[in-house]
Amino acid sequence: MSGILPHLLAASLYAFLGFHFWRTRWSQVAPKAPAGIRAWERLALALALMLHGNVLYDELFGGGVMRFGFSAALSLMLWLAVLIYWVESFHARLEGLQPLVLPLAAACTLLPSLFPGQHLLANVASPMFRIHFFIA
């Protein structure tokens, strides 16, 4: 898949989950909030992460060259934040973070399609560059 459709799918799923968590965890009209994150919520978040990860991979490594820009960096940071949150949700209760993080992730998922100003990276074959990039 190419174009804006994969970005829209991932962003829509993040936005839906953010709205859902806001209604069930933060809203004053919500009934008693469920304890912890439910299985379907965790699965939907995993699906959003996979869609967003696929979009990022295509943005960064599509066409056989590596491209990186400001919008891709923001998208990558929010993907990593949601991934860390998702993994940590298996071990600790982190309610209250979803309504904050997921709308930002939805917005940042769309950024690479709206602002595609990326430049080609020259030293991608260098092992030192690869180490630096993956550590950063």
Feature roles, as predicted:
Residues 51-101, 124:
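Membrane-interface helix-loop-helix modules in multi-pass inner-membrane proteins
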Residues 92-136:
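Hydrophobic alpha-helical segments and helix pairs
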Residues 18-41:
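Membrane-interface helix-loop junction between the first two transmembrane segments
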Residues 42-59, 107-114:
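A generic, lipid-embedded transmembrane alpha helix
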Residues 1, 30-35, 54, 58-70, ...:
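Membrane-interface interhelical loops and short amphipathic "cap" helices
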Residues 1-16:
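Hydrophobic transmembrane alpha-helical segments in integral membrane proteins
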Residues 16, 77-85, 106-110:
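Alpha-helical transmembrane segments and their membrane-interface exit regions
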Residues 35-45, 71-72, 94-106:
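Cytoplasmic-side transmembrane-helix entry/capping segments in multi-pass membrane proteins
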